[in-house]
Amino acid sequence: MDAFDVIKTPIVSEKTMKLIEEENRLVFYVERKATKADVRAAIKELFDAEVADINTSITPKGKKKAYITLKDEYNAGEVAASLGIY
């Protein structure tokens, strides 16, 4: 699966801004069929960042969210800034 097909869009809200600042986490809508391994590979390819942990959930509307915790060497704020959301 192509990295651009896996990662659909970042989620920007007060909650996600708090996660970026305090927990070094990013939140994206991802392709519903994408596995955690697909998401990990897409983050590595698109942002050159190593992933420490991924949690996923499917919303009642059927969209899949990925909560991505980056390793300590990487800053979620810098990745968010490169996306233009922070």
UniProtKB/Swiss-Prot annotation:
An example Gene Ontology biological process: translation
Cellular compartments per GO CC: ribonucleoprotein complex; ribosome
PROSITE patterns assigned: RIBOSOMAL_L23
GO molecular function: rRNA binding; structural constituent of ribosome
Coiled-coil segments on the chain, per record: none
Keyword Nuclease applies: no
Sorted UniProt keywords: Ribonucleoprotein, Ribosomal protein, RNA-binding, rRNA-binding
Pfam families per the UniProt record, alphabetical: Ribosomal_L23
Listed InterPro entries: Nucleotide-bd_a/b_plait_sf, Ribosomal_uL23, Ribosomal_uL23-like, Ribosomal_uL23/eL15/eS24_sf, Ribosomal_uL23_CS
Gene3D superfamilies per UniProt: 3.30.70.330
Subunit structure comment from the entry: Part of the 50S ribosomal subunit. Contacts protein L29.
Function text: Binds to 23S rRNA. One of the proteins that surrounds the polypeptide exit tunnel on the outside of the ribosome.
Family the entry assigns: Belongs to the universal ribosomal protein uL23 family.
HAMAP family, alphabetized: Ribosomal_uL23_A (MF_01369_A), Ribosomal_uL23_B (MF_01369_B)
Protein's name according to its UniProt entry: Large ribosomal subunit protein uL23
Organism the protein comes from: Methanococcus maripaludis (strain DSM 14266 / JCM 13030 / NBRC 101832 / S2 / LL)
